[in-house]
């Protein structure tokens, strides 16, 4: 008998994956956690029934959420990641030679532990790097307790439900601004404009109310609903579209390129209409 994973993040649409093997499934203090091996996309991290990442395409998300803000900032030395227990974002951050310290703040220790065990190629030992500090705890509380400390804050969260819901609130972005240095930058994954336009619009508006420079950029991520995903970047000073990205990167990537950095900010008309005007049916 075939076993299928059915993901129902969108109420009127589902995605299904044929499972080869269930590697772990448990109830943690915060969520249901599973790691499954699928035929189509390899091993996947699944939280509360929603796919978070897969071995086959994880690099798209992790490269885009990292290199866009880190190349926008002229000298990022200290970076905070809220969420991101799989370690992929830390892996990409530590490719930048200017980075002296990267803090991973993950609320669920089981995510870190099980990803190290079953998805080791995602972190690629980055969490053991001397520049990385892993803090198990509430990201909102951590941000509130640190002022004028980080050059870049990356919200590498699950979807805006359950434990991650507070990470999408407008008041939280004000706290992030206080956590950042005077020319700091923040970025967050902000869902798909196809199925969740109201979230994309709300986060964009909330960021714009706090950060003078707020932009939306896009990436093609097959694992996620619609395959077309948005990220919102907020900056106190620096424009990500004018970032001085080197013509040749000093490290290897699979998705991000200097030309793609600029191109990712070119939005289709329906997304422009969404963020620059009222949502229409």
From Swiss-Prot:
Spermidine binds at residues 62, 86, 156-159. Pathway: Amine and polyamine biosynthesis; spermidine biosynthesis; spermidine from putrescine: step 1/1. S-methyl-5'-thioadenosine binds at residues 31, 106, 138-139. GO terms for cellular component: cytosol. The keyword Disulfide bond does not apply. Pfam families: Spermine_synt_N (PF17284), Spermine_synth (PF01564). GO terms for biological process: spermidine biosynthetic process. It is found in: Cytoplasm. Its EC number is 2.5.1.16. It is an enzyme of class 2 (transferase). Its main location: cytoplasm. The active site is at 156 (proton acceptor). InterPro entries: PABS, PABS_CS, SAM-dependent_MTases_sf, Spermi_synthase, Spermidine_synt_N, Spermidine_synt_N_sf. Keywords: Cytoplasm, Polyamine biosynthesis, Spermidine biosynthesis, Transferase. It catalyses: S-adenosyl 3-(methylsulfanyl)propylamine + putrescine = S-methyl-5'-thioadenosine + spermidine + H(+). It comes from the Bacteria. Residues 2-236 form the PABS domain. GO terms for molecular function: spermidine synthase activity. PANTHER family: SPERMIDINE SYNTHASE, SPERMIDINE/SPERMINE SYNTHASE. Homodimer or homotetramer. Catalyzes the irreversible transfer of a propylamine group from the amino donor S-adenosylmethioninamine (decarboxy-AdoMet) to putrescine (1,4-diaminobutane) to yield spermidine. Belongs to the spermidine/spermine synthase family. This is Polyamine aminopropyltransferase. It comes from Clostridium tetani (strain Massachusetts / E88). The lineage of its organism: Bacteria, Bacillati, Bacillota, Clostridia, Eubacteriales. The gene is speE.
């Amino acid at each position: 008998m075939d076993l299928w994973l059915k993901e129902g993040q969108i109420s009127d649409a589902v995605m299904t994956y044929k499972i080869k093997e269930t590697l772990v499934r448990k109830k943690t203090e915060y969520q249901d956690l599973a790691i499954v091996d699928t035929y189509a996309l390899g091993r996947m991290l699944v939280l509360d029934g929603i796919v978070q990442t897969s071995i086959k395409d994880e690099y798209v998300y992790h490269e885009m959420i990292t290199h866009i803000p880190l190349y926008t900032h002229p000298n990022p030395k200290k970076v905070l990641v809220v969420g991101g227990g799989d370690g992929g974002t830390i892996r990409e951050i530590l490719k930048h030679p200017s980075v002296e310290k990267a803090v991973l703040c993950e609320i669920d220790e089981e995510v870190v532990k099980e990803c190290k065990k079953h998805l080791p190629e995602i972190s690629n030992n980055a969490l053991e790097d001397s520049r990385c500090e892993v803090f198990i705890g509430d990201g909102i509380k951590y941000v509130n307790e640190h002022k004028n400390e980080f050059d870049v804050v990356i919200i590498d969260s699950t979807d805006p439900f359950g434990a991650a819901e507070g990470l999408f609130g407008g008041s939280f972005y004000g706290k992030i601004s206080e956590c950042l240095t005077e020319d700091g930058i923040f970025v967050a994954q902000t869902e798909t404009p196809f199925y969740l336009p109201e979230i994309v619009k709300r986060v964009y508006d909330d960021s714009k109310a706090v950060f003078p420079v707020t932009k939306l950029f896009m990436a093609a991520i097959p694992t996620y609903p619609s395959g077309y995903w948005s990220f919102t970047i907020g900056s106190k000073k620096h424009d990500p579209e004018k970032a001085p990205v080197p013509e040749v990167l000093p490290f290897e990537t699979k998705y991000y390129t200097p030309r793609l950095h600029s191109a990712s900010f070119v939005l289709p008309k329906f997304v422009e209409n969404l963020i620059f005007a009222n949502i229409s049916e």
